[in-house]
Amino acid sequence: MAKKTITRIAKINLLGGQAKPGPALASVGINMGEFTKQFNEKTKDKQGEMIPCVITAYNDKSFDFILKTTPVSILLKQAAKLEKGAKNAKTIVGKITMAKAKEIAQYKLVDLNANTVEAALKMVLGTAKQMGIEVIE
């Protein structure tokens, strides 16, 4: 039996429970119908959330995929009830509490390059600052 070799690793963002075959998946070179079925099954509890996904495609058209947590920027916009962040970091467009920022840091800890909640919180606070979201005590 031939050994499977990796042909491509792709990172794409899809809406939870709503993946459809399309150009983003076609370029990866996998069975799109099977992928969308498996992806939608795994993300049915996260309907409408943006889910980053890392797809590993193999030479025999098989694949593996890993689901990541929702991006910090989207979580911050949801917490501050915003459509989008500020055009520049000096313009304040919304506010969230420190408790909410800690909650986001705790949720994102598994995917961030941080070992502690405090380090993850610094990353979340930096993202909030760049988006024009003020963090209040």
From Swiss-Prot:
Superkingdom of origin: Bacteria
A GO biological-process term: translation
Post-translational modification as stated in the protein's UniProt record: One or more lysine residues are methylated.
Keywords recorded for this protein, A-Z: Methylation, Ribonucleoprotein, Ribosomal protein, RNA-binding, rRNA-binding
SMART domains: RL11 (SM00649)
CDD domains the record matches: Ribosomal_L11
Similarity comment: family membership: Belongs to the universal ribosomal protein uL11 family.
Subunit structure: Part of the ribosomal stalk of the 50S ribosomal subunit. Interacts with L10 and the large rRNA to form the base of the stalk. L10 forms an elongated spine to which L12 dimers bind in a sequential fashion forming a multimeric L10(L12)X complex.
Protein name in the entry: Large ribosomal subunit protein uL11
